């Protein structure tokens, strides 16, 4: 059986990258929460 995680850097950036997060309202909320939490990395 094929495993679910097949890593690809391009897809990783395109779906979870900073610019993608900034594009939507929800994504900006994610970044805001991560800033408040004090995350070292806000996005991939």
Curated annotation (Swiss-Prot):
Entry coiled-coil feature ranges: none
Tree of life domain: Bacteria
Keyword vocabulary terms for this entry: Ribonucleoprotein, Ribosomal protein
BP-aspect Gene Ontology terms: translation
CC terms in the record's Gene Ontology section: ribonucleoprotein complex; ribosome
A GO MF label: structural constituent of ribosome
Signal peptide bounds: none
Pfam families noted in UniProt: Ribosomal_L34
Keyword Endoplasmic reticulum set for record: no
Family from the record: Belongs to the bacterial ribosomal protein bL34 family.
Protein name, entry field: Large ribosomal subunit protein bL34
Gene label: rpmH
